[in-house]
């Protein structure tokens, strides 16, 4: 049976376009798999751009707006992109936020392992709720280099869920493209999990947790999800 690298029908993603899912699966089979197995001449950055281009296929056929056009597959530091993303609904917030009473323009720094601190703040009483600020564009290549270092270890036989969880967090915080970031990353992660004889996992709230937790907590939650997930959607 053909593997679906996108177990995405969950609380936050119920209306995924099937073409989008198909594009993701093809991008893994034709681009990422050859890269991961060292059968490609693409660099790490070229691989990301190529996979992104194949997924969007000149369109953003995702779940928020199936006809929303997006820019070419360029990193956000190569184009003029806003540096914040809203979390769409307050009820989707992770558990940790229940203990926070944010006020307008509160600024909190979260340490992400050994990379520059990631800053976010909340805006109360708005429809979009918490607003997350991405690292400045000047840090994008720095994060990509860290991602590549981790990926090289995975490609060279380090079958480590710790490294894989760290890769997810680096990628989520980097947010290299304007759109279609987490789908791309999780398709890679699910491909690797399948190679390691684990069941591919759903997105869940993992991206939110990457934004709001230090690395050790993110990896703990990722491991729990891998061990618990049975593929039942």
Language-model features: locations:
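FIC/Doc superfamily catalytic core
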Residues: 1-233
């Amino acid at each position: 049976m053909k593997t679906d690298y996108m177990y995405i029908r969950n609380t936050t993603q119920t209306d995924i376009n099937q073409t989008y899912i198909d594009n993701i699966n093809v991008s893994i089979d034709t681009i990422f798999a050859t890269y991961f197995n060292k059968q490609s001449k693409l660099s790490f950055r070229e691989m990301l751009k190529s996979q992104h281009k194949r997924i969007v296929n000149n369109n953003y056929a995702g779940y928020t707006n199936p006809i929303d056009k997006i820019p070419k597959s360029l990193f956000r530091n190569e184009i003029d992109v806003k540096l914040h993303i809203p979390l769409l609904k307050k009820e989707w917030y992770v558990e940790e936020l229940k203990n926070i009473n944010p006020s307008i323009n509160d600024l909190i720094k979260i340490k992400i392992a050994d990379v520059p601190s990631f800053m976010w703040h909340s805006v109360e009483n708005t429809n979009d709720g918490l607003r997350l600020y991405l690292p400045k564009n000047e840090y994008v290549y720095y994060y990509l280099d860290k991602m590549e270092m981790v990926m090289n270890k995975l490609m060279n036989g380090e079958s480590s869920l710790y490294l894989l969880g760290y890769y997810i967090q680096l990628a989520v915080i980097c947010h290299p493209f304007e759109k279609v970031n987490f789908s791309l990353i999780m398709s890679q992660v699910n491909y690797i999990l399948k190679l390691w004889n684990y069941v591919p996992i759903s997105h869940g709230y993992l991206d939110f947790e990457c934004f709001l937790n230090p690395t050790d907590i993110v990896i703990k939650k990722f491991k729990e999800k891998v061990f618990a997930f049975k593929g039942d959607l």
